[in-house]
Every structure is written in structure tokens, then in C-alpha cells.
Amino acid sequence: MFDANCLKLMFVAGSQDFYHIKGGKNDRINALLDTLELALQSQITAFQFRQKGDLALQDPVEIKQLALKCQKLCQKYGTPFIINDEVRLALELKADGVHVGQEDMAIEEVIALCKKHQFIGLSVNTLEQALKARHLDAVAYFGVGPIFPTPSKKDKQVVGVELLKKIRDSGVKKPLIAIGGITTHNASKLREYGGIAVISAITQARDKALAIEKLLNNA
């Protein structure tokens, strides 16, 4: 079951987001698992498993193994576990949710496969995309961004806080979660529009627990 409160602070990450860690693939995997457990203890409200980018795992077996470990941690703390893009994996692992973008599997197909099993999040980068999908009851929330410049979405045009305002003012009733370049310094600008999703604000933080506390207080 979907509860919009889980959008307050969503941590999004994969092993590739620990590129700053010395060592190889296994060191990045361990860094993800350690950071996820700390984040769960610090009361993030959801975790989204996302393997994308140059250093992302490529072997489906390794991806599944890591996803399972992340899922077990989320279950231990009673926190929703969401899989980004990998619809089949979300179904196989019985993830709580699945999040897809505009370039991933067609949203109608995702709904047909997942609506009885997972809640569904959809990324929107324009007002038109939000208006087009507003009638899809099976879509639980919209992920809106990138709000600020971000290295994880280099090819996407920054949409700014203005897009959140336009979507809300257009009468779209779905919960919104902002993503892209969100930090402890700018998160407060987004409070009135819904939740926030972050990657580097947690993975790159020296004091991760403190960063999460600040993000939760701002969200």
C-alpha cells in the first residue's frame, strides 16, 4: 500500500554513487550497504535502488544480489523499498514500489505489469508530461526534476522550483517528489511542494546522519 508520507525523504542510490571510495567494485557495494543502514537508522522515509551510470553493476546476477541485500535492510527497518527502472526485478523481488522515467518502459505497460503488486512512481520533466499522466490512477506519485543542476542527470535540462509550482497550480493532485541537485542548503525551498529525493546529499556527506537530520527538518 502506498503512503505519501514515504516521499518526505527518499534516498536514491546504487553502488556507482560511491565512486569517491578508494578501491574497487566490492568496496563501493559495501559502502552502499553501510550507508543505507545508517540512513535507515537516521529515518529516511524510503529507499530507491538505482543502478545507472559508468560504474554501475552490469551483471544481472550481481544487481539482483545487491538489490536483495538492500531490500532486506529496508525490511529490517520497515522502510519502503523501491526499484528504479528494472520493472522485472521489482516484480521478481516483490519490491514495494517501482519508479520509471520517460525513456524507460511505456507507463501503460508498467501499470499493466505492476499495479497489483507495486506502487508506481513516474518521472516528469515538463508540465505537459504531468498533465498527460495525471489521469493514470495507478501512478502513485510524480518525481519532478532535475530541480537544480546535478551530475546524475547531466543530459537533462534543469527545470527549477518553477516546474513544481506550475504542476501544483495546474490542479494536478498527485503527490510530488523533487529530485536533482538537492542539498541541505536548498531543501527548504521545496518544503511546500511535497517530498525530496537525494543521492549525493547523503552519499557525499562527511556526517551522513547529520545531513539526513537537516534534510528531514527542511523537508
From Swiss-Prot:
Assigned GO CC terms: cytoplasm
Role noted for this protein: Condenses 4-methyl-5-(beta-hydroxyethyl)thiazole monophosphate (THZ-P) and 2-methyl-4-amino-5-hydroxymethyl pyrimidine pyrophosphate (HMP-PP) to form thiamine monophosphate (TMP).
Binding site for 4-amino-2-methyl-5-(diphosphooxymethyl)pyrimidine: Q48, F49, R50, Q51, K52, N84, S123, K153
High-level lineage: Bacteria, Pseudomonadati, Campylobacterota, Epsilonproteobacteria, Campylobacterales
Chain positions recorded as Mg(2+) binding sites: D85, D104
Matches recorded under CDD domains: TMP_TenI
Catalytic activity: 2-[(2R,5Z)-2-carboxy-4-methylthiazol-5(2H)-ylidene]ethyl phosphate + 4-amino-2-methyl-5-(diphosphooxymethyl)pyrimidine + 2 H(+) = thiamine phosphate + CO2 + diphosphate; 2-(2-carboxy-4-methylthiazol-5-yl)ethyl phosphate + 4-amino-2-methyl-5-(diphosphooxymethyl)pyrimidine + 2 H(+) = thiamine phosphate + CO2 + diphosphate; 4-methyl-5-(2-phosphooxyethyl)-thiazole + 4-amino-2-methyl-5-(diphosphooxymethyl)pyrimidine + H(+) = thiamine phosphate + diphosphate
Protein name according to UniProt: Thiamine-phosphate synthase
Annotated metabolic or biological route of this protein: Cofactor biosynthesis; thiamine diphosphate biosynthesis; thiamine phosphate from 4-amino-2-methyl-5-diphosphomethylpyrimidine and 4-methyl-5-(2-phosphoethyl)-thiazole: step 1/1
A molecular function (GO) term: magnesium ion binding
Annotated positions binding 2-[(2R,5Z)-2-carboxy-4-methylthiazol-5(2H)-ylidene]ethyl phosphate: T150, P151, S152, G181, I199, S200
GO BP annotations, alphabetical order: thiamine biosynthetic process; thiamine diphosphate biosynthetic process
Free-text remark on how the cofactor is bound: Binds 1 Mg(2+) ion per subunit.
Membership in a protein family: Belongs to the thiamine-phosphate synthase family.
Transferase is among the record's keywords: yes
Keywords, comma-separated and alphabetical: Magnesium, Metal-binding, Thiamine biosynthesis, Transferase
Enzyme Commission number, as recorded: 2.5.1.3
Cofactor requirements of the protein: Mg(2+)
Domain of life: Bacteria
